[in-house]
Structures are given as C-alpha cells and as structure tokens.
C-alpha cells in the first residue's frame, strides 16, 4: 500500500536510526528489494568494520547490474552461467555516523568531481561510493589485481569476492606469507602500476588495505585514491611507500630506499641537498625556481639543476660561481626572476604595489548597492511602460 502525502511528510528520529552504524531505513529498503527480486541472497553478518564502511558476505545473481557500472553479465565469462549465483562482497558505506570526517580533502582538486555537496552527508557518501567504483574500474582496466564492481545503489556497493566461497582472502597483516621478498615486490609493483597505468595514488595503502590469496596481492579500499595531478598526490605517494617499507622491514625484508622508489615511480628528481635525508609525507620537493623561498636554498637548487644538466658541481665551484649558477638555471628553466635574491624581493614588491594600485582604481569606480537598486528600478519601470 502506497503512503499518503501526509505520511510521506512525517519524519521521525527512528528513520535515521542505524544497525551496525550503516543499516538505516533507506539502506534496508534497497537490500530488501534486491533480495525480493532474487538478485542478492544469503546475506551474512558483518565480515569487518572500517572507518568508512562495513563489509558483508553474500551471494548475487550474475544478472545483477546497475546503470552506473554498466557491466551486465561481466561477472563471469563462462557461457551458460547467465543468472547463476556467485559469491560477492557487499560494502555499505556509513552515512549517519561520520567516523571518517576528512573525506573532502580526498575529493577536492579532483577534476572528476568538481561539484559535490558537503552539507548533506548522504550526497557526499554517494559521491564517495561512485569515486570508489571509478577507481576500481581503472584498476581493472590496468590489470591490477583488485575486486570487480558489480552493482552500485546509493551507499551500497556489490563487488566480486577475493577468495573462495568458504575461504575469504585474509588481509596482508593476517596472512601467512612464505615468499616475503616476492610479496614486497608485488606491493611495489601495485604502487608503480597504479601511478603509471591507472594514473592514481592509493593514499591509504598499508597491510590493512591489501589482501593475500594464493600468492597474489590484491588492493582494496580505493575510495580515497586520488589522481596523480591532485594537490596532495605527492604527499600521499610518499606515505604509501613509507607504509609498505615499514611493514616489510618489520618482517625482516631488505626494502628499497624510500627516496629511490619515489623518484622511480613519480619521475620527480629529489634535489642533491636532500639526497641523504629520508623524505617524509610532509616533505616539499621544488620543481622550479619560483617555488624556492630564500637565497640560500636558491643557490643550492641552482647548483643541483646545473649538476643534473652538466655533471656534478663541487662546493668550490658553487662558491666561486654562485651568482652565475643562479642566472644559468633561471635561463634554462624559463624563470622570470633575475640574478640574486635581492632582485627577487624587489620584483615581489613591485608586483604588490601594482596590485594595490589596481584595487584602488577599482574601488574608486565601484557602484554602491543603493545606486544599483535605483538603476534596476528605473530599468524595470521603462520596460513596463514599453509593454
């Protein structure tokens, strides 16, 4: 029986009540419809609980599909299995209790998500779920071991299960690994392929977000993954590398140096004066002269740029030809700054003075709100008289 208009307007606190922090009234209604249609069966209890979602085991029909994913019958490629039941994982994102409160910083600066609502948690979660599906499809297309998305509706995501019906793939943290060195190389390859093939940085890669099954490492939880041109992509990449190195070094594996992995994967070159320092996630690596703040760092950056182009430069060469190095590096990088730090400061002062002058002229010619209203009323009156 359909609800009347008056009943639809009634809202109660119980409508927002949740079970397991994710199963509210709307979510339960979607699950009940899927079960009534025979698309989702044998939904079991919570497999694990994370900061952003709960994961449940179940079984789904191979005919299950959604408009957003558009992959009907792609769960299995074997002919004659259309409409059969396969094991799946149901990931339900939390809506009422936002234990993962900094989702916005992973979505902002993403060209794929220019407009999103931050005041409505349900709309934000919907964007987050869509982001995870898009990232998973990128990984699937790049051949990176990961689950395949099957169905998406609001905050409910159905994916293929990693493992067998009776055996779910354990997290890397809980797995018994015989070949630790090979497993480490697989993890490094995942970071490299995500960056170079899929154009993504995981941003939360650790032993908790990797599964290990039959000697293969699978990557999961890519909702927070960002594109490589994201403002924080470099920071997240360093964090992922350090997390993997830290885990395997505790296991006794001889890991590669974080700086070397960062240079190999990202293609960025760490300056010579930072080579002996293990970069952290908050490290800033300048790529042009305009990003260098003071004169001392400018000379070091110039010497580093010169040595990369013409070979190594000694300290004596730097002291004798410091100003020339600055000038040469500026010319090679196409920078607008002139020789030395003093001229740079003068240039900044001149630009600041120009901006102040332009703002003063703009304020002088600004029309007040009262004058705008008077002009608008006169325009409306003239329009009415013409009609």
Curated annotation (Swiss-Prot):
It catalyses: L-seryl-[protein] + ATP = O-phospho-L-seryl-[protein] + ADP + H(+); L-threonyl-[protein] + ATP = O-phospho-L-threonyl-[protein] + ADP + H(+); ATP + H2O = ADP + phosphate + H(+). Its main location: cytoplasm. Its cofactor is Mg(2+). Mg(2+) binds at residues 209, 221. ATP binds at residue 91. One of its GO terms (cellular component) is cytoplasm. GO terms for molecular function: ATP binding; hydrolase activity; metal ion binding; protein serine kinase activity; protein serine/threonine kinase activity. Residues 309-372 are annotated as: Disordered. Required for the final endonucleolytic cleavage at site D converting 20S pre-rRNA into the mature 18S rRNA. Required for the final steps of cytoplasmic maturation of the 40S ribosomal subunit. Despite the protein kinase domain is proposed to act predominantly as an ATPase. Has a role in the cell cycle where it is required for entrance into S-phase and in the control of the onset of anaphase. Appears to also be involved in the maintenance of chromosome stability and correct mitotic segregation. This is Probable serine/threonine-protein kinase RIO1 homolog. It comes from Encephalitozoon cuniculi (strain GB-M1) (Microsporidian parasite).
